[in-house]
């Protein structure tokens, strides 16, 4: 997802909920003031379809977890926020192994903003997204490698920054507006882009 929750595009929601019954969602986030009330925005579109939905909120920057306790999730959401904090928290081999295992089991993985960025092999961090106000290319989880993504493309007016960043990498950067997304297969190939 190119922006923040909730998912407002009904085409995206239908693609997620029509594929299978969803009983459990795991949301990975990082600690910030008043984080708990915000979490409802990630799940509200699913609650209307699945009223008995179980949801777990995990903050890997403040707690240790046993990933084996979360192998039954149908949907995994990686939240948005401070991109560099998300990268520092979630870009590691253990989390990568968990996400790949869950994708192979058929789980849907949804990243919002920072959570979407870190799914790629390389991460484009816009100058609008860091305190140094510099273009940064960082390592990600490597779930896709034939492109990078730019989030909040429209609201950040990121066209010129994206063009400069593309000179630093040898693959294209796909722009995602706040309410658009790319849908990938489990090998990281683009199935569809929804604007």
Indicate where each model-derived feature is located:
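Conserved Motif II region of HX4D acyltransferases
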Residues: 83
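N-terminal beta1-alpha1 cap of cysteine-dependent amidohydrolase-like domains
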Residues: 1-75
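Active-site-adjacent pocket-lining segments in enzyme domains
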Residues: 72, 79, 87-108, 115-195
């Amino acid at each position: 997802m190119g922006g923040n929750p909730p998912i407002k595009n009904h085409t995206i929601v239908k693609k997620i909920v029509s594929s299978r019954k969803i009983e459990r969602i795991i949301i990975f986030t990082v600690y910030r003031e008043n984080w708990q009330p915000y979490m409802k925005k990630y799940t509200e579109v699913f609650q209307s379809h699945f009223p008995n939905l179980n949801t777990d909120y995990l903050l890997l920057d403040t707690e240790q977890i046993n990933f084996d306790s979360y192998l039954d999730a149908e949907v995994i959401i990686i939240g948005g926020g401070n991109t560099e904090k998300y990268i520092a928290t979630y870009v590691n081999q253990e989390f990568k192994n968990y996400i790949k295992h869950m994708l192979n089991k058929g789980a849907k993985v949804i990243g919002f903003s920072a959570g979407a960025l870190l799914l790629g092999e390389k991460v484009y961090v816009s100058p609008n997204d860091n305190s140094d106000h510099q273009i940064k290319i960082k390592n990600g989880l490597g779930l896709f490698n034939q492109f990078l993504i730019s989030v909040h493309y429209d609201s950040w007016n990121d066209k010129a920054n994206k063009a400069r960043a593309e000179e630093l990498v040898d693959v294209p950067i796909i722009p995602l507006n706040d309410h658009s997304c790319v849908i990938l297969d489990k090998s990281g190939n683009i199935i569809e882009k929804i604007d």
